[in-house]
């Protein structure tokens, strides 16, 4: 049943660390959890065109947990986040301090290989589907880029293809994506494509290899982002067995869209 479990939460504490790092008295934990959610929602909404992969929040002892919050935003377009002469970033810090009533320490980290980040791949597919590209075409483009930049496996799923009234799930995979192996470094993300005929749900899994004892997930992530591109061939692309077989009429209709 590994395919029914969120791959990120399944590996937290084993090979992955938390995106929120802080300790607090149990009386204020609910307020801080809510504050984290508000901060992430604000940043994702403000920088929805800046290719934000994830947001890390820290309230460590040396930061004086009640008064200071350290936020690290990982983005594929750091220039959009910072702005000219850091004007956009200063505006963001002021808005966050007003929102949280706390001092904000704001850092921006560049994502150098967005092709192997599941969140950004899902966002890219959603944008292509919103521009009326076919699911197969957008999937093929993302697969080619991800496998070229050292991804060892990728899998995608989507629903309500072609605007049909009855939802049907169709997926493809290339390479290997082990879901049951805890030491397997698997990224997972979801995205929604707002189309003229409704919302399409997209799921993406990307496999980067195994993390062995003594290795750190964060160190390997930085190494992947800074390493040179090399071509790692994947397996044969195959359709998911979950979806029903498509007729020639369905294929022609979707190809026309």
Swiss-Prot record:
Name of the protein this chain belongs to: Small ribosomal subunit protein uS3
Top-level division of the source organism's lineage: Bacteria
HAMAP family for this protein: Ribosomal_uS3_B (MF_01309_B)
PANTHER family: 30S/40S RIBOSOMAL PROTEIN S3 (PTHR11760), SMALL RIBOSOMAL SUBUNIT PROTEIN US3C (PTHR11760:SF19)
Entry-linked Gene3D superfamilies: 3.30.300.20, Ribosomal protein S3, C-terminal domain (3.30.1140.32)
Gene name linked to the record: rpsC
GO cellular component: cytosolic small ribosomal subunit
Subunit-level organization: Part of the 30S ribosomal subunit. Forms a tight complex with proteins S10 and S14.
């Amino acid at each position: 049943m590994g395919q029914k479990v969120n791959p990120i939460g399944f590996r937290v504490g084993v090979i992955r660390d938390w995106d929120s790092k802080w300790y607090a008295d149990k009386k204020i934990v609910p307020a801080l959890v809510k504050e984290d959610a508000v901060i992430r929602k604000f940043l994702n909404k403000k920088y929805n065109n800046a290719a934000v992969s994830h947001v890390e929040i820290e309230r460590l002892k040396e930061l004086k947990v009640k008064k200071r919050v350290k936020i690290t935003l990982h983005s594929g377009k750091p220039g959009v986040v910072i702005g000219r002469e850091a004007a956009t970033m200063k505006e963001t810090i002021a808005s966050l301090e007003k929102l949280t009533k706390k001092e904000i320490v704001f850092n921006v980290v560049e994502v150098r290989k967005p092709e192997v980040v599941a969140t950004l791949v899902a966002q890219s597919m959603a944008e292509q589907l919103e521009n009326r590209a076919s699911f197969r075409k957008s999937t093929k483009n993302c697969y080619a880029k991800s496998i070229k930049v050292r991804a060892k496996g990728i899998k995608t799923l989507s629903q309500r293809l072609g605007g049909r009234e009855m939802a049907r799930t169709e997926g493809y995979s290339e390479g290997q994506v082990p879901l049951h192996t805890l030491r397997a470094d698997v990224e997972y993300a979801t995205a929604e494509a707002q189309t003229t005929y409704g919302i399409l749900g997209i799921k993406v899994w990307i496999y980067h290899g195994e993390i062995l004892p003594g290795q750190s997930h964060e160190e390997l992530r930085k190494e992947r982002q800074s390493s040179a591109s090399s071509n790692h061939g994947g397996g044969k692309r195959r359709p998911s067995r979950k979806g029903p077989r498509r007729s020639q009429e369905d294929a022609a209709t979707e190809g026309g869209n």
